[in-house]
Amino acid sequence: MNTTYDYIIVGAGSAGCVLADRLSASGEHYILLLEAGGSDRSIFIQMPTALSYPMNSEKYAWQFETQPEAGLDSRSLHCPRGRVLGGSSSINGMVYVRGHACDYDEWVEQGAEGWSYQECLPYFRRAESWIHGEDTYRGGDGPVGTCNGNDMELNPLYQAFIDAGQQAGYPKTDDYNGYQQEGFGPMHMTVDKGIRASTSNAYLRRAMKRSNLTVRKGVVTRKVLIKNKQAIGVEIEVGGKVQSVYANTEVLLSAGSVGSPQLLQLSGIGPKAVLEQAGIAVKHDLPGVGENLQDHLEVYFQYACHQPITLNSKLGLISKGLIGTRWILQKDGLGATNHFESCAFIRSRAGLKWPNIQYHFLPAAMRYDGQAAFDGHGFQVHVGPNKPQSRGRIWITSADPHQKPNIEFNYISTEQDKQDWRDCIRLTREILAQPAMDDYRGEEIQPGADITSDEAMDAWVRQNVESAYHPSCTCKMGSDNDPMTVLNKDCQVRGIDSLRVIDSSVFPTIPNGNLNAPTIMVAEKAADAILGNTPLSPSNAPTWIAPQWETEQRNGAAQRPMFHQQRK
């Protein structure tokens, strides 16, 4: 086996597959891609509707648990991360959200020069093949296919939710990934011709045909090898046997927001006190490694449905068999969607320049494990505030790479985060009370009509909120003036040569949306930096900001007003 390559990429996930493809494309560089997991060739991964299976499987995901969270009545939350070709893009819900333009301008304000929306948009476009073709915002011939599932045609509840949002005084948006994120509209997904568009399918399949790319599965990366403040390779373990492989040019960590800080710390790069307590020799004291941890939380608003039109009638074995058979034969129908086909992004209060609350609408009432939430028909809205103030951390407690790191998000630890949740619940009730839902809306199952006071809402959220599985920001990019910055603008580790981190851990702050699309964008942009390519020319595409954002929470009045909030 060859032991020396030009580039070693650790993690064949959302970012690593992109890097493997882009760095191997010219044929002049020899690339080694290391993945702890195995093949993604499974109907449970490839068929979009089966998304709950890989997410909850030991075979395809690291099944992490958080430390007991003080803000959640000491509950520990589930935190699965992909451990398979494609990484979390092979186990996620396939929701395609780029985030708001202001999220990226915020990165620049945080010191990540070169990552403004105008500079990121060309890379979003390069990665994407939007089913309706390219325009100023959307890509038309990129590797990742995106669509709206079944275009909301298989259930009237999708459109009813959009109509209810407009009746509540919010705008409609035809494309939240384009000019206007704020508002109610169709939701987009990484599904291409009925099949999950993971980065394994989109990038790695074609790259694996090249002789200069070597992909090794079932490999545990134990640490980065550091010599004189330079990364020279990695120590790996295969079948219990430990060996070293070397990089002539660079080592690239794409192990995710849990795995990358863990690996840096195991390599002696991180907060000195953490390393010493774990029995690790300090190679480089970098206090920000594992800090700044952010995530999205969500709850399910669940209602009974008066009409027998929801997916609850499709949960039996016969229905699942018919859906699966049609998908196998035709790659369409209910098997070819994640079922989140309408959505919304709104601001919870006046004075917010861009949305901080996201809705996923589902024409069923079920749990994340795919089981029905209650007997009969129902629908639900997944909702949560997406710009939390709370920050957590990840740290190792042992030099053993097989021991899971400690993960503490410190959820809902500020008063503003608590207030955002109260506003979120009241605003959601008001939206679902609008006339467009009258023909469908039955009893409020969850939270329940008795959850009305601040105290009751706080308690219900603490007991019922779940992670949206968006851990991020643990190796943040920024300026050298910030002592907690881990990476420079080119994703290079401060103080260590020939070592970069490229995945969702590099985000300075979490975007308003799901993380797969921005992670792919980061990898596309970083690939150009690694290769020394001239960055794509910045876009001058405009973006919509609510004209009265400083004084108005929304642009209109609700037909059935229920929410009374002080204007700023």
From Swiss-Prot:
Protein name from the UniProt record: Oxygen-dependent choline dehydrogenase
Taxonomic source organism: Photobacterium profundum (strain SS9)
Keyword annotations from UniProtKB, A to Z: FAD, Flavoprotein, NAD, Oxidoreductase
Family: Belongs to the GMC oxidoreductase family.
One Pfam family from the record: GMC_oxred_C
Organism lineage: Bacteria, Pseudomonadati, Pseudomonadota, Gammaproteobacteria, Vibrionales
Top-level lineage group: Bacteria
Enzyme class label: oxidoreductase
Any one GO molecular function term: choline dehydrogenase activity
PROSITE patterns per the UniProt record, alphabetical: GMC_OXRED_1 (PS00623), GMC_OXRED_2 (PS00624)
